[in-house]
Amino acid sequence: MEIYLIGQYQFDGSEPTYRCFYEESDAKRCARELIEESEDDDEEAMEVTWDDFLDRWDCWVCFMEVLEVE
């Protein structure tokens, strides 16, 4: 089974927050919402891939992982 983990680091240095999803589509929807919140230009956020997510967010701000669990 795969678990999709999206995390967001806090700018104040406190612990990061995590969101876990069992479905890839739900994780992508969350990633899309995070991107839309950060940008005023909606036309760039129409279809989000994992590469888009990683390209748009600095690694110190957000991260995304796919975990394999049994």
Show which residues each predicted segment covers:
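Short aromatic-glycine-(Arg/Gly/Cys) micro-motifs in beta-strand/loop hairpins
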Residues: 1-17, 43
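Broad hydrophobic/π-residue packing in well-ordered secondary structure
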Residues: 2-4, 21, 30, 67
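Intrinsic disorder/low-structure terminal segments
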Residues: 10, 17-20, 52, 62
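Short, flexible N-terminal segments of the mature chain
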Residues: 17-38
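Short, mixed-charge low-complexity intrinsically disordered segments
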Residues: 33-70
